[in-house]
């Protein structure tokens, strides 16, 4: 503890003025916050012993006074976080995102372990690719947000996936079991009356600040405009988007959905669901920092439980929070992680709420 106090005094130039604790302030990232003693700000206090020069610079820039001990402007981050680029406010079209979103038809929820039933998560999309030999496969996921747009990861529409897997070919909605037609389930073999639909891709819009090949995968988000409007059914419905200022809580269990690899290493034919806990941002940053990856506030960490995580085929797929009235919100997009299901290593998700303005500014009727 004495060592920590020494470093605190070493970090900060002790200004000759005093400021009232709990006064309003603005962090180096421009976030409105409160000026508090350093030991009352866990996110900054825990980073005092860092050797990262940028974090040290951020700590010093966070000092907002001195009142017996350094006071700091205590926000949500301990490092500089360039805000996501958003479209001009005048171009935003929030009315194109439906209010009737995030609902699913009530059904028996569990068939076998993490299997879903056909009515669950009806916004889940499969993104298909075709290579030069006309071989087709689904390699990414996405989520329907209105009758014309899918939101997915930028790495699913650009870069390596196009070189290795093939060109973007189609989007499938309303799928449940890729091995059966029609989809039937249960002891009495209840069959889904609607077939899945395949739609063409009119346009893809990746975030302008996404850098292909970056190990940090900042701004890993993209939109796919379908070639026609979608009619909503019990098996095809849009998900809700969170507001930019809405945050999930550490320990809160969210649901990741997709057809990715199971614990056997095989891709599932049935749409899967898995509950994963939200991990503290600073703990996640420390874990991945050891591997040279810097996690930002525009990213969300969840998982880290042994043999429980999203895997390769789920890239771009949804991480969901269930709120009041059983309404689901798209909190994250599967971006990347360590080896699938490795204990202590959570998955990294693009935090969708941080990009709502960008989404609203890039969709059209």
Curated annotation (Swiss-Prot):
Domain Clip span(s) in chain numbering: 24-74
Site location (Cleavage): 109-110
Mod. after translation: Cleaved following the recognition of pathogen-derived products, probably by a lysyl endopeptidase.
Keyword Protein biosynthesis among UniProt keywords: no
Glycan attachment points: 131
Regulation: Protein stability and endopeptidase activity are calcium dependent. First cleavage on prophenoloxidase PPO1 and PPO2 is not dependent on calcium; however, cleavage of PPO1 and PPO2 to their active forms is dependent on calcium and on the presence of PPAF2 and PPAF3. Cleavage of PPAF2 is inhibited by calcium. Inhibited by ethylenediaminetetraacetic acid (EDTA), p-nitrophenyl-p'-guanido-benzoate, diisopropylphosphorofluoridate (iPr2PF) and p-(Amidinophenyl)methanesulfonyl fluoride (p-APMSF).
Residues the record lists as binding Ca(2+): 175, 177, 180, 183
GO cellular component: extracellular space
Domain writeup: The clip domain consists of 35-55 residues which are 'knitted' together usually by 3 conserved disulfide bonds forming a clip-like compact structure. The clip domain is necessary for regulating the zymogen activation.
Functional description taken from the UniProt entry: Serine endopeptidase which, by cleaving prophenoloxidase PPO1 and PPO2, is required for the activation of the prophenoloxidase cascade probably following the recognition of pathogen-derived products.
Protein name per the record: Phenoloxidase-activating factor 1
Organism: Holotrichia diomphalia
């Amino acid at each position: 503890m004495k060592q920590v106090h020494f470093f605190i005094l070493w970090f900060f130039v002790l200004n000759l003025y005093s400021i009232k604790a709990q006064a309003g302030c603005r962090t180096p990232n421009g976030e409105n916050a409160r000026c508090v003693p350093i030991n009352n700000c866990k996110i900054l206090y825990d980073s005092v012993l860092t050797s990262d020069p940028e974090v040290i610079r951020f700590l010093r820039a966070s000092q907002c006074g001195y009142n017996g001990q350094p006071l700091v402007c205590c926000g949500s981050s301990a490092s500089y976080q360039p805000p996501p680029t958003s479209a001009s406010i005048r171009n935003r079209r929030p009315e194109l995102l439906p209010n009737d979103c995030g609902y699913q038809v009530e059904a028996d929820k569990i068939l076998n372990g993490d299997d879903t039933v056909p009515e669950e998560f009806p916004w889940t999309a499969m993104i298909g690719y075709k290579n030069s030999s006309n071989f087709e496969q689904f390699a990414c996921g996405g989520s329907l947000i209105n009758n014309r747009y899918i939101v997915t990861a930028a790495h699913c529409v650009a870069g390596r996936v196009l070189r290795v897997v093939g060109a973007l070919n189609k989007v499938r909605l309303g799928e449940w079991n890729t091995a059966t037609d029609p989809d039937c389930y249960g002891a009495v073999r209840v069959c889904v009356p609607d077939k899945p639909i395949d739609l063409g891709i009119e346009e893809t819009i990746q975030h302008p600040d996404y850098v292909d090949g970056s190990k940090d995968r900042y701004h890993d988000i993209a939109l796919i405009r379908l070639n026609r409007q979608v009619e909503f059914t019990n098996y095809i419905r849009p998900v809700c988007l969170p507001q930019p200022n809405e945050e999930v809580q550490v320990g809160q269990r969210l649901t990741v959905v997709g057809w990715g690899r199971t614990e056997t290493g095989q891709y599932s034919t049935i749409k899967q669901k898995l509950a994963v806990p939200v991990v503290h941002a600073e703990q996640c940053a420390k874990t991945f920092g050891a591997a040279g990856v810097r996690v930002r506030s525009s990213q969300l960490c969840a998982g880290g439980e042994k043999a429980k995580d999203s895997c390769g085929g789920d890239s771009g797929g949804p991480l969901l929070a269930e709120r009041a009235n059983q309404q689901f919100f798209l909190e994250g997009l599967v971006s990347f992680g360590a080896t699938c299901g490795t204990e202590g290593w959570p998955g990294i998700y693009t935090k969708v709420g941080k990009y709502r303005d960008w989404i609203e500014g890039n969709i059209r009727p």
